[in-house]
UniProtKB/Swiss-Prot annotation:
<dbReference type="InterPro" id="IPR050271">
    <property type="entry name" value="UDP-glycosyltransferase"/>
</dbReference>
<dbReference type="GO" id="GO:0008202">
    <property type="term" value="P:steroid metabolic process"/>
</dbReference>
<dbReference type="GO" id="GO:0045939">
    <property type="term" value="P:negative regulation of steroid metabolic process"/>
</dbReference>
<keyword id="KW-1133">Transmembrane helix</keyword>
<dbReference type="GO" id="GO:0005496">
    <property type="term" value="F:steroid binding"/>
</dbReference>
<dbReference type="GO" id="GO:0001972">
    <property type="term" value="F:retinoic acid binding"/>
</dbReference>
<keyword id="KW-0472">Membrane</keyword>
<dbReference type="GO" id="GO:0009804">
    <property type="term" value="P:coumarin metabolic process"/>
</dbReference>
<dbReference type="GO" id="GO:0005789">
    <property type="term" value="C:endoplasmic reticulum membrane"/>
</dbReference>
<dbReference type="GO" id="GO:0042803">
    <property type="term" value="F:protein homodimerization activity"/>
</dbReference>
<dbReference type="GO" id="GO:0015020">
    <property type="term" value="F:glucuronosyltransferase activity"/>
</dbReference>
<dbReference type="GO" id="GO:0005504">
    <property type="term" value="F:fatty acid binding"/>
</dbReference>
<dbReference type="GO" id="GO:0009812">
    <property type="term" value="P:flavonoid metabolic process"/>
</dbReference>
<comment type="subunit">
    <text>Homodimer. Homooligomer. Interacts with UGT1A1, UGT1A3, UGT1A4, UGT1A6, UGT1A7, UGT1A9 and UGT1A10 to form heterodimers. Isoform 1 interacts with isoform 2/i2 suggesting that oligomerization is involved in negative regulation of transferase activity by isoform 2. Isoform 1 also interacts with respective i2 isoforms of UGT1A1, UGT1A3, UGT1A4, UGT1A6, UGT1A7, UGT1A9 and UGT1A10.</text>
</comment>
<dbReference type="GO" id="GO:0006631">
    <property type="term" value="P:fatty acid metabolic process"/>
</dbReference>
<keyword id="KW-0256">Endoplasmic reticulum</keyword>
<dbReference type="GO" id="GO:0001889">
    <property type="term" value="P:liver development"/>
</dbReference>
Length: 530
């Protein structure tokens, strides 16, 4: 018998999905961050363009990657620095990581990174000095701003034009995420950045965690001083970091609880960890040939990210020596000077299709700096890691993966050739590392919505509703003592003390009355006996 109606929900779901595909077109302003930050943000922007939205990207004329191959309106503005200045400051910053690992905000403040960050911060002043561009943005009637908060310029733009904003970030430095979202972060089990602690901290680590929290309040204002001065100049009023971050409508955070430790979250914090992962593509013939030639031993993928172009000669030779002692073929993304002791099993390449190689069944291990992009590609493809973190959240990412048994962490500044060799043999030959990373991969992929689709939904949500005020906690409207209920505690303490005082006075009065009466009785009794 022919069916006269839909008895299955599948056609209805397909119909709804198709209907959702035709979103009501909006107008979005994008203020991105250069470098690797742009790679994943670009995927969201491209999908929003495909869904029919009018997207305008505002970027400096001097940049590495911004705005390339985008089918949308790109508005540029001149900067006070050249590409050579940018490259020089970045190289100084990158080279400094091979001298000492930054594990406190005080050492970061004293390091050479200040010049690099201040260069990035300065371009926002250039944006607002372009009066023609500012006038264009003012007249464009955008629905929202999609921004990377690293250099604060997107936050300044959102506040200047009074637009709802969607923040796109792995995490936020200092205490700005907790303050901006009014999200609690108990220091007893939520480790601060740079420390590389797990959520099961010893007493000594908890003490250090509290000290780091104090450091954030002491030194972050100095670290962000240049950005806040520019913001105050543009907005023509004194501005704090809280003033900028607290108006965020939605926080799109490139993490999840497969990588991160469980902790409190707020309703406007959306987790899109793994958004950079994608289905593996066929490998270029060159790399397919390398894999075929590797035989049964397979390959090891080695990349320290775009940040590292040169490794000190002595360290590079120690690494090359270790790589030559394993039977696998090593594909090493490296643009520096070729180590003189490079073994036949190690192939240097200037670029490699990292995600596609990690997705190949012959890949045995991944040597990485533990940047969030690489870590998630490793999780998605189920490849155990040897992690050599250098800076920022890399130490924290590495600790999280090591805690979960998915890899081994080495101190790249102190490790020897034997350390790297032993770590590689451990993650390749010990099946527990592969089993653990496959378990994490299964957990990560078991989700109702893909991270990219989730990110696109929330950007469109903010565009449709002009923000998300219903998700904004009332904590933003409280003073610090109200937030911590110090006024309530003080009131209740006063009540308890008042009651205790009155009770004490009543008891003392009764006691005196009783003693006085008893004394008179005794006195009367004595007089009668005489």
């Amino acid at each position: 018998m022919a069916r006269t109606g839909w008895t299955s929900p599948i056609p209805l779901c397909v119909s709804l999905l198709l209907t959702c595909g035709f979103a009501e077109a909006g107008k979005l302003l994008v203020v991105p961050m250069d470098g690797s930050h742009w790679f994943t943000m670009q995927s969201v922007v491209e999908k929003l363009i495909l869904r029919g939205h009018e997207v305008v990207v505002v970027m400096p004329e001097v940049s590495w990657q911004l705005g390339k191959s985008l089918n949308c309106t790109v508005k540029t503005y001149s900067t006070s620095y050249t590409l050579e200045d940018l490259d020089r400051e970045f190289m100084d910053f990158a080279d400094a990581q091979w001298k000492a690992q930054v594990r406190s905000l005080f050492s970061l403040f004293l390091s050479s990174s200040n010049g690099f960050f201040n260069l990035f911060f300065s371009h926002c002043r250039s944006l607002f000095n372009d009066r023609k561009l500012v006038e264009y943005l003012k007249e464009s009637s955008f629905d929202a701003v999609f921004l990377d908060p690293f250099d604060a310029c997107g936050l300044i733009v959102a506040k200047y034009f009074s637009l709802p904003s969607v923040v796109f970030a792995r995490g936020i430095a200092c205490h700005y995420l907790e303050e901006g979202a009014q999200c609690p972060a108990p220091l007893s089990y939520v480790p601060r950045i740079l420390l590389g602690f797990s959520d099961a901290m010893t007493f000594k680590e908890r003490v250090r965690n509290h000290i780091m929290h104090l450091e954030e309040h002491l030194f972050c204002q100095y670290f962000s001083k240049n950005a806040l001065e520019i913001a105050s100049e543009i907005l023509q009023t004194p501005v704090t970091a809280y003033d900028l971050y607290s108006h965020t409508s939605i926080w799109l955070l490139r993490t999840d609880f497969v990588l991160d430790y469980p902790k409190p979250v707020m309703p406007n914090m959306i987790f899109i960890g793994g958004i950079n992962c994608h289905q593996g593509k066929p490998l270029p013939m060159e790399f397919e040939a390398y894999i075929n030639a590797s035989g049964e031993h397979g390959i090891v993928v080695f990349s320290l990210g775009s940040m590292v172009s040169e490794i000190p000669e002595k360290k590079a030779m120690a690494i090359a020596d270790a790589l030559g002692k394993i039977p696998q073929t090593v594909l090493w993304r490296y643009t520096g000077t070729r180590p003189s002791n490079l073994a036949n099993n190690t192939i240097l390449v200037k670029w490699l299709p990292q995600n596609d190689l990690l997705g190949h069944p012959m890949t045995r291990a991944f040597i990485t700096h533990a940047g969030s992009h690489g870590v998630y590609e490793s999780i998605c493809n189920g490849v155990p890691m040897v992690m050599m973190p250098l800076f920022g959240d890399q130490m924290d990412n590495a600790k999280r993966m090591e805690t979960k048994g998915a890899g081994v962490t080495l101190n790249v500044l102190e490790m020897t050739s034997e350390d790297l060799e032993n770590a590689l043999k451990a993650v390749i030959n010990d099946k527990s590392y592969k089993e653990n990373i496959m378990r994490l991969s299964s957990l990560h992929k078991d989700r109702p919505v893909e991270p990219l689709d989730l990110a696109v939904f929330w950007v469109e949500f903010v565009m449709r509703h002009k923000g998300a005020p219903h998700l904004r906690p009332a904590a933003h409207d409280l003073t610090w003592y109200q937030y911590h209920s110090l006024d309530v505690i003080g009131f209740l303490l006063a009540v308890v003390l008042t009651v205790a005082f009155i009770t004490f006075k009543c008891c003392a009065y009764g006691y005196r009355k009783c003693l006085g009466k008893k004394g008179r009785v005794k006195k009367a009794h004595k007089s009668k006996t005489h």
